[in-house]
């Protein structure tokens, strides 16, 4: 509730009653990906793979690495955001990046780049629970063509990673385009400082520690707790361990992770969007064909645009509001220098 007794627009609560139980295929293996933390926390809960901030303690932070700021300097007069509509997902990606000034604006020759799609679920592309594989493959091709010295592609899947990476079509498409695919086994994580309002440390996939550039490639979909899952929410997939504890304050934890990563570029996949029963989906009746890709470096602006595709007011999406407050971007995407093509 707000101070004047009105309901908080984005207060976390239980998922809607008509929300189906999550697909738990492979969750035993997922639970096995707890890295670095073995002690029980908070009322006997299991190890999480990250540490919540202890507001009552004044302990020194351990000497852990911090993920560097991956943002690229914006050239004078450059376009902030590109929105492209058309039937060919790969062409939409190319046109969006061209409108921003080309991949060379974001990736320099020899740099190490990690690409982060959503590969959380054991779903087919048509079910719109994961990023479209054609979108992902084109991003990889553009990064390779820009001269990147190393291109990783990774995500910490919720369902069994082997199934998610294969059934989504992303692993095959990314490898064919030139990426090194990193599955989230226990050896793939490194503990880092998060230094957020809620999160203190976390076990993250190692490419995010080693990369020079980070490219976020999320899908637009409804989410039962956070209302939507898009750019900012996609950073849950860098963490090892069980992430359910973060749902108790989902909007702040989303912003903590986004502030930790600070990506170079975000390419928002709205080829197909999931309108209901997210984030897992499953029914084609919940999927809408949008044939849209948006790209830019302001994740808050991109998520505000994505929210409108889901029929949401960006001001009602907590992580968009909190992201703006944290200085991660603006929800006023129409005020940015934006190019719209097609449609």
Give residue spans per PLM region.
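N-terminal and secondary-structure boundary signal
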Residues: 2-343
């Amino acid at each position: 509730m707000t101070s004047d007794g009105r309901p908080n627009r984005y207060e976390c609560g239980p998922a809607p009653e008509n929300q189906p139980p999550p697909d738990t295929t492979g969750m035993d293996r997922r639970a096995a990906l707890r890295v670095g933390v073995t002690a029980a926390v908070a009322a006997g809960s299991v190890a999480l793979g990250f540490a919540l901030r202890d507001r009552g303690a004044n302990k020194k932070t351990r000497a852990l690495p911090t993920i560097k700021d991956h943002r690229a300097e914006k050239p004078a007069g450059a376009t902030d955001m590109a929105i492209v509509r058309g039937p060919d997902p790969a062409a939409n990606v190319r046109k969006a990046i061209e409108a921003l000034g080309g991949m060379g604006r974001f990736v320099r020759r020899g740099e190490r780049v990690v690409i982060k799609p959503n590969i959380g679920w054991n779903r087919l592309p048509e079910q719109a629970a994961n990023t479209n594989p054609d979108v992902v493959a084109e991003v990889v091709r553009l990064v390779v063509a820009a001269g990147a010295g190393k291109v990783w592609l990774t995500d910490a899947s919720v369902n069994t990673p082997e199934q998610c990476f294969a059934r989504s079509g992303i692993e095959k498409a990314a490898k064919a385009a030139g990426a090194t695919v990193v599955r989230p086994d226990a050896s793939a994580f490194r503990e880092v400082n998060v230094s957020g309002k809620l999160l203190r440390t976390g076990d993250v996939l190692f490419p995010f520690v080693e990369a020079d550039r980070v490219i976020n490639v999320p899908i637009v979909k409804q989410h039962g707790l956070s209302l939507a899952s898009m750019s900012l929410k996609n950073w849950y997939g860098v963490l090892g361990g069980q992430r359910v504890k973060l749902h108790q304050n989902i909007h702040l934890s989303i912003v903590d992770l986004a502030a930790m990563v600070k990506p170079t570029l975000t390419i928002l996949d709205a080829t197909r969007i999931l309108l209901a029963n997210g984030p897992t989906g499953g029914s084609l009746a919940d999927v809408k064909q949008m044939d849209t890709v948006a790209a830019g470096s302001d994740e808050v602006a991109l998520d505000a645009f994505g929210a409108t595709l889901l029929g949401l007011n960006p001001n009602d999406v907590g992580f968009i509001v909190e992201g703006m407050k944290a200085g991660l971007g603006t929800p006023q995407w129409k005020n940015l220098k934006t190019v719209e093509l097609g449609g």
